[in-house]
């Protein structure tokens, strides 16, 4: 199941290209989040939504830039800049941005980067909204005034350490990166890791970083969303006060890239040096977020590997007891998505054995599809996940995030009802068609990650 913070429809960024959703089932309540959207003269988009359940306000700022937008040889810049944004600006001292927010009682305070966007968010008591807006505006408009070579070098080392811990010394970390590289080969912008490569991080100069900021961190390339208990007129005045005077500029062009198409099965072997158990990973290209087939892919991922009754878990973990764990997911991204299956073997079980069993499950799905009970369970899971997030104004999956996500993907913040409806509209035939058309054995990447003692038994690569 995708997170709402997952991606932006860049190459397909028009409302008309969103997956058409049928009406909700009769008797289902039509949900919506009331909002007002407008734009400042400098191009900054603003979305306001009042929610008076609690005296708090979520400030959520999205910049329309992620790893997808990075130039060759500049991987990791979007994520590196997420770090730099907390290091102080012209009117905010070094390393006090977070502490200033914590002093006023901020929660859900963070920044995240993925392939399609970078965001910054915090939830504050309503009477401290102005402080949060001032802090966000100061780093949007005046970060470069305080950016130094020393700060850059410090954060480069922090990010490089993150890469060591999250990729290079993490179980299957390098294996997963190798799989992704094969699924999205150069020159596709999804090829590089969000965290970047050591080589590119080492090469990043102060001038490079400043140029990245000037291009992508302009008001015209950002959306500010405020959700919670606030006075609309006063908040508009505050937004104008702190953001309206920032210089504008053109909205940067987004890369336009043709979808990648696999024409054969690509087999990759990886000698796993961190984990002690073999792992099998399979990956296919899949429809972009909110386009036709995206919801069916989510449903199928749930049927395959969510819960003890799921197809792969029941067969591989419970019945045959050859797998330690199974995962399946539709990683929905803006330009093109990825459907992945990951199985960790039990001791003594080869990845070839896992592959045969996974293929047997997939072939059964292609022939017979899923059951109505499985479809209903997947629908309920998505509804529950979505609606539970809406209980909060901020944080991951909260109202501010939801409004930002839909606005980011299709330019329309009020897509909640349609999003829920598209899952209700998925039919048994839709899922069967997806399995047959998208999860073909002749258009996928298969990775065998095997620890050294068992490595000789792993299949040879055919790259």
Named regions from a protein language model:
Residues 11, 15-48, 231-272, 279, ...:
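Proteolytic maturation boundary segments
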Residues 3-13:
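Sec-dependent N-terminal signal peptides
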Residues 77-85, 300:
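Active-site His/Glu-centered metal-binding helix of metallohydrolases
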Residues 149, 156, 210-242, 443:
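Non-catalytic, conformational "gating/processing" segments within enzyme and secreted inhibitor domains
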Residues 47-49, 54-72, 76-80, 94-142, ...:
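M16 family metallopeptidases and their MPP-like homologs
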Residues 164, 169, 181, 251-309, ...:
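His/Glu-based metal-binding/catalytic segments typifying zinc-dependent metallopeptidases
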Residues 87-90, 141-150, 370-371:
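Short, polar/flexible loop-turn hinges at active-site or ligand-entry regions and domain interfaces
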Residues 20-36, 181-222, 254-259, 288, ...:
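Histidine-acidic residue clusters that define the catalytic metal-binding segment
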């Amino acid at each position: 199941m995708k997170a709402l913070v997952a991606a932006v429809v860049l190459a397909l960024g028009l409302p008309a290209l969103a997956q058409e959703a049928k009406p909700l089932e009769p008797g289902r309540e039509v949900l919506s989040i009331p909002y007002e959207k407008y734009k400042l003269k400098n191009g900054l988009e603003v979305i306001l939504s009042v929610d008076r359940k609690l005296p708090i306000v979520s400030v959520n700022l999205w910049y329309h830039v992620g790893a997808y937008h990075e130039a060759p040889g500049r991987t990791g810049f979007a994520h590196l800049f997420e770090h730099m944004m907390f290091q102080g600006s012209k009117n905010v001292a070094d390393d006090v941005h977070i502490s200033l927010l914590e002093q006023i009682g901020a929660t859900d305070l963070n920044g995240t980067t993925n392939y399609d966007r970078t965001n910054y968010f915090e939830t504050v008591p309503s009477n401290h909204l102005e402080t949060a807006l001032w802090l966000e505006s100061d780093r949007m408009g005046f970060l470069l005034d305080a950016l130094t070579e020393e700060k850059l070098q410090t954060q480069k080392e922090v990010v490089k350490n993150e890469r060591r811990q999250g990729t290079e010394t993490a179980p299957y970390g390098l294996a997963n990166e190798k799989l992704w590289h094969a699924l999205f080969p150069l020159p596709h912008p999804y090829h590089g890791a969000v965290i970047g490569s050591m080589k590119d991080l080492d090469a990043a100069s102060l001038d490079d970083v400043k140029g990245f900021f000037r291009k992508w961190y302009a008001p015209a390339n950002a959306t500010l969303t405020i959700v919670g208990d606030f006075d609309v007129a006063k908040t508009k005045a505050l937004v104008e006060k702190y953001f309206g005077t920032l210089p504008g500029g053109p909205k940067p062009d987004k890369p336009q890239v043709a979808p990648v198409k696999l024409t054969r099965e690509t087999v990759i072997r990886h000698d796993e040096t961190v984990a002690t158990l073999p792992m099998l990973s399979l990956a296919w290209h899949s429809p972009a977020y909110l386009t036709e087939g995206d919801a069916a892919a989510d449903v199928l991922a749930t049927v395959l590997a969510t819960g003890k009754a799921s197809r792969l878990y029941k067969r591989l973990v419970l019945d045959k007891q050859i797998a330690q764990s199974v995962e399946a997911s539709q990683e929905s991204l803006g330009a093109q998505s990825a459907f992945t299956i990951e199985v960790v073997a039990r001791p003594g079980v080869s990845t070839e054995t896992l592959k045969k069993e996974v293929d047997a499950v997939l072939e059964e799905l292609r022939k017979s599809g899923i059951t109505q009970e499985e479809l209903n369970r997947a629908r309920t899971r998505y509804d529950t996940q979505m609606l539970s997030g809406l209980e909060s104004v901020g944080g991951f999956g909260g109202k501010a995030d939801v409004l930002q996500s839909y606005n980011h993907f299709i330019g329309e913040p009020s897509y909640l009802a349609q999003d829920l409806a598209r899952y209700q509209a998925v039919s048994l035939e839709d899922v069967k068609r997806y399995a047959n058309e998208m999860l073909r054995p002749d258009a996928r990447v298969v990775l065998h990650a095997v620890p050294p003692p068992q490595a000789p038994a792993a299949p040879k690569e055919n790259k």
